[in-house]
Curated annotation (Swiss-Prot):
GO MF entries: heme binding; iron ion binding; monooxygenase activity; oxidoreductase activity, acting on paired donors, with incorporation or reduction of molecular oxygen
Cross-link Glycyl lysine isopeptide (Lys-Gly) (interchain with G-Cter in ubiquitin) mapped to chain: K254
UniProt topology in membrane: Single-pass membrane protein
Coiled-coil blocks: none
Keyword Heme among UniProt keywords: yes
Domain of life: Eukaryota
Cofactors demanded by this protein: heme
Function: Involved in the biosynthesis of pyridine alkaloid natural products, leading mainly to the production of anabasine, anatabine, nicotine and nornicotine, effective deterrents against herbivores with antiparasitic and pesticide properties (neurotoxins); nornicotine serves as the precursor in the synthesis of the carcinogen compound N'-nitrosonornicotine (NNN). Catalyzes the demethylation of nicotine to form nornicotine.
UniProt KW keywords: Alkaloid metabolism, Heme, Iron, Isopeptide bond, Membrane, Metal-binding, Monooxygenase, Oxidoreductase, Transmembrane, Transmembrane helix, Ubl conjugation
Primary site of residence: membrane
Residues annotated as binding heme: C457
Catalysed reaction, written as an equation: (S)-nicotine + reduced [NADPH--hemoprotein reductase] + O2 = (S)-nornicotine + formaldehyde + oxidized [NADPH--hemoprotein reductase] + H2O + H(+)
Protein name as it appears in the record: Nicotine N-demethylase CYP82E4
Length: 517
């Protein structure tokens, strides 16, 4: 099988014409172009620069190093598309304030066609009538504060059940528990319950859900794989599959869609039997969307069923993966900073006590816990480069001319560790957020863990509710130490997201009365 680079080289002669057409300018811009990193080749651009360079750090770290060399605004080419990387307050504000509407489109990636319901998923859809209508539905009917309030008891019950499960795993003073796996199970089970009304437990769930979990992990891998068409978006290359990724995408999508289709049919049948509003039957997210969405096409050629399944998939991706990832980093930071952990425990003991568990209504009084969550999101934002944007027309960023069709990476990780904006930027210090009004809403352009502007994350409120409540329970309920009494390894994995290479494995001990578990 040909490697990605061999495939490119073999087809390079077919791309010269398209390359020159792609890069041709009708007139010279009045503003200068941003700095471009050296080493680019004709046609393929800087693909070699990021291809197996022996650096296994996250892409955000690599791009951060380039910003140190070439400045907080620079460009490079991944094949034909031009990529703009920004990491300064001024440039980020230009992109998500002044030019917010211009940068509201999404670049086309092949996985969006084959895995993302032909880009019907909310985070993949281009800015336009379909996206606006679907986002409005999600924000007002599915992820609104009032709707999430109705699911408050579901979140609490699920977290309580998982805490009890964690307690039963304690075996003396030497049993090591994989907290990373526990967090993944908790968040996956919680979102499945809220979306489809299903109770899922590892090893006890139905076969379909287990198959979906496998397909979900395959999606995460395939969506980050290099595909020829992504670098050379030419119709001919859409059907070239030297690497076998398209075949794998189709197979994975089939497994994912079969689960969502089954859930959808169950809910449609339930509605037909008029069981949705029967006493004792709660409305989950699919019930809500079915009640609000007509059976008509919603634009862009999507059917109602496709939109529902695509929306469900978007919610699962955000809730099951990024939330667990963030809490995992948060607990690792606390274990390595025992003074902060002790202070958080003392705050909960004082404000809540030790004779009941923290509830969502308590969070507003737990100021130090809120500061911890903010600081974890500063150091390890769930989307360190955000989802890529693309400008629909020429614009100006930090005084530079940015041609139409440029792909935008906002290096949030670099921005939120900028020593010009943050003191001791690489140090875990929740105190920095105690006497400040900086929040998560994306209006403080030095702190945008959930993005900013029109394309900011619609699931932010849900994510913060789960993160605060889960971390509060873990802080309140247990004491922790590492198996070797050494600090946890904080090595970051390669790729677009920031995953901890090694799981958080701990020896835990309860700190509340046994009857509370």
């Amino acid at each position: 099988m040909l490697s990605p680079i061999e495939a490119i080289v073999g087809l390079v002669t077919f791309t010269f014409l398209f390359y020159f057409l792609w890069t041709k300018k009708s007139q010279k811009p009045s503003k200068p172009l941003p700095p471009k990193i050296p080493g680019g080749w004709p046609v393929i651009g800087h693909l070699f620069h990021f291809n197996d360079d022996g650096d296994d750090r996250p892409l955000a770290r690599k791009l951060g190093d380039l910003a140190d060399k070439y400045g907080p605004v620079f460009t490079f080419r991944l094949g034909l598309p031009l990529v703009l990387v920004v990491s300064s307050y001024e440039a980020v504000k230009d992109c998500f304030s002044t030019n917010d509407a211009i940068f509201s489109n999404r670049p086309a990636f092949l996985y969006g066609d084959y895995l993302g319901y032909n880009n019907a998923m909310l985070f993949l859809a281009n800015y336009g009538p379909y996206w606006r209508k679907n986002r409005k539905l999600v924000i007002q009917e599915v992820l609104s504060a009032s709707r999430l309030e109705k699911f408050k008891h579901v979140r609490f019950a699920r977290i309580q059940a998982s805490i009890k499960n964690l307690y039963t795993r304690i075996d003396g003073n030497s049993s090591t528990i994989n907290l990373t796996d526990w967090l993944e199970e908790l968040n996956f089970g919680l979102i499945v319950k809220m979306i489809a009304g299903k109770n899922y437990e590892s090893g006890k769930g139905d076969e379909q859900v287990e198959r979906f979990k496998k397909a979900f992990k395959d999606f995460m891998i395939l969506s980050m794989e290099f595909v020829l068409w992504d670098a050379f978006p030419i119709p001919l290359f859409k059907w070239v599959d030297f690497q076998g990724h398209v075949k794998a995408m189709k197979r994975t999508f089939k497994d994912i869609d079969s689960v969502f289709q089954n859930w959808l049919e169950e809910h449609i049948n339930k509605r037909e039997k008029m069981e949705v509003n029967a006493e004792g039957n709660e409305q989950d997210f699919i019930d809500v969307v079915l009640s609000k969405m007509s059976n008509e096409y919603l634009g862009e050629g999507y059917s109602r069923d496709t939109v529902i399944k695509a929306t469900v998939f978007s919610l699962v991706l955000d809730a099951a993966d990024t939330v667990a990832l963030h809490i995992n980093w948060g607990m690792a930071l606390l274990i390595n900073n025992q003074k902060a952990l002790t202070k958080a425990q003392e705050e909960i003991d004082t404000k809540v006590g030790k004779d009941r568990w923290v509830e969502e209504s308590d969070i507003k009084d737990l100021v130090y816990l809120q500061a911890i969550v903010k600081e974890v999101l500063r150091l390890y934002p769930p989307g360190p480069l955000l989802v890529p944007h693309e400008n629909v027309e020429d614009c100006v960023v930090s005084g530079y001319h940015i041609p139409k069709g440029t792909r935008l990476f906002a290096n949030v990780m670099k921005l939120q560790r900028d020593p010009k904006l943050w003191s001791d930027p690489d140090t875990f210090d929740p105190e920095r957020f105690i006497a400040t009004d900086i929040d998560f809403r994306g209006q403080y352009y030095k702190y945008i863990p959930f993005g900013s502007g029109r394309r900011s994350c619609p699931g932010m409120t849900y994510a913060l509710q789960v993160e605060h409540l889960t971390m509060a329970h873990l802080i309140q309920g247990f004491n922790y130490r590492t198996p070797n009494d050494e600090p946890l390894d904080m090595k970051e994995g390669a790729g677009i997201t920031i995953r901890k290479v090694n799981p958080v494995e701990l020896i835990i001990a309860p700190r509340l009365a046994p009857e509370l578990y």
